[in-house]
Amino acid sequence: MLTPLAPSVKRAPRKTLFAKPYVQVLVAILLGVAVGHFYPQIGENLKPLGDAFIKLVKMIIAPVIFLTVSTGIAGMSDLQKVGRVAGKAMVYFVTFSTLALIVGLIVGNVIQPGAGLNIDLTSLDVQAVNGYASKAHEQSVTGFLMNMIPTTIVGAFVEGDILQVLFFSVLFGIALAMVGESGKSVLSFLQDLTAPVFKLVGILMKAAPIGAFGAMAFTIGKYGIGSVANLAMLVGTFYLTAFLFVFGVLGAVCRYNGFSIFSLIRYIKEELLLVLGTSSSEAALPSLMEKMEKAGAKRSVVGLVIPTGYSFNLDGTNIYMTLAALFIAQATNTDLSVGDQVLLLLVAMLSSKGAAGVTGAGFVTLAATLSVVPAVPVAGMALILGVDRFMSECRALTNLVGNAVASLVVARWEGELDQAQLKAAFCGHQPAETSAGQPLITPAPSNSAASLPVESPGWSQTPDDRAAGSKQTLAGR
């Protein structure tokens, strides 16, 4: 007769508060603000810390995307799923990117953050924005699409272009699936290679507090908190609009699809704080992909949706573009008719696609939009150049949440979301720290729920018990 486990089973050791990654990043951000404010020269000199961390993360992004996408697609029994997932993802991206643009227009017209400033265009330093405007003129729809195709396979990985790596990874995954039995050894090798690569991601994430500290100290030291005061209405309106979009629009989408936006944000809090510190949603891409897979979304869906979303689903950038354009028009007393605003919306829908998830890309995209919309003066961008960095954090945070929601929603539409695993992950039954270095491969639907670690109210399993009870880790504990 089997006897139940006694409540006296040894409890798993709990982390102290400061040992939690998100607490370390939060403390680092606060220290960075303090150093940048009180010692601005030192703060500016700490910029290499943030730059070095972002470069370290970019170093691993291409291998993570390649391994995740190629193994996910190669493991599909039906290759038509690739087209379905991509199609559903694009429908989602276009729908909610357009909604973000519309929300920015509506809030901008209601609050009118630039009204009453009466800025004279001749008094603005247009030289400050010439560099961004020249970059904007280099962008075109045809050029963007052609740039998705790498010149060489090696070149895509060397340059670290997300869309080029994704393009090759999809083709390679399809080819690997088509060769059948003879490709299984290659697939097995790539699956084995995933373990050390994600372990490396965990190691790199341990440096996140240092990177966040350096980046925040530089931002405050160079631009100063006081620079926000003059344009506080614009910054405040943008943050309010992003808040309404995340908790209103995306919150409703989450509820309709069976989960809570609050639970999702709590689940990805480490990634959000990392983005807050670095102002770049790209810094959290590897760990976000790992988190979404742990939450029950199939690897093939996560690998397609999130990297693609970093170019096609930038909700924060979309809100920023329409709101900033309206602010410039209002501040310079430029009247925008309904037709002008519709043109602004249509142009922004195109120019926002392909905006990279790196710091400052939103400003270049705004320049590209205004250069096509003659009613809004491009020179007016000089007004917001000083506070753009402070809005960059909010753009990146909104982009990150939007892509996290997209991956779960598209996975659910495709029937590739394990609801039991999602609930368990949101409740903390699976390791949430990306620094653990032990990513889960999405389990098969037949046994995914059964393999979850169970935790009763009166006791918890030891780490060894968990390792013995779960076969889904890529590397043993």
Swiss-Prot record:
**What is the protein named?**
C4-dicarboxylate transport protein 1
Q: Indicate yes or no for the key word Cell membrane.
A: yes
Family per similarity comment: Belongs to the dicarboxylate/amino acid:cation symporter (DAACS) (TC 2.A.23) family.
Q: What InterPro entries does UniProt report for this protein, alphabetically?
A: C4_dicarb_transport (IPR023954), Na-dicarboxylate_symporter (IPR001991), Na-dicarboxylate_symporter_CS (IPR018107), Na:dicarbo_symporter_sf (IPR036458)
Q: List GO molecular-function terms, semicolon-separated.
A: fumarate transmembrane transporter activity; malate:proton symporter activity; succinate transmembrane transporter activity
- Membrane spanning stretches: 21-39, 59-76, 89-111, 162-179, 200-221, 231-253, 342-364, 368-387
Broad class of the protein's primary localization? membrane
- Its Gene Ontology biological processes? L-aspartate transmembrane transport
Lineage here is:
Bacteria, Pseudomonadati, Pseudomonadota, Alphaproteobacteria, Hyphomicrobiales
- What PANTHER family does UniProt report for this protein, alphabetically? AEROBIC C4-DICARBOXYLATE TRANSPORT PROTEIN, PROTON/GLUTAMATE-ASPARTATE SYMPORTER
| Chain positions covered by the region annotation Disordered | 435-477
Q: Which UniProt keywords apply?
A: Cell inner membrane, Cell membrane, Membrane, Symport, Transmembrane, Transmembrane helix, Transport
Which residues does UniProt assign to the signal peptide?
none
Query: According to its UniProt entry, what is the function of this protein?
Result: Responsible for the transport of dicarboxylates such as succinate, fumarate, and malate from the periplasm across the membrane. This transport system plays an important role in the energy supply of rhizobium-legume symbionts.
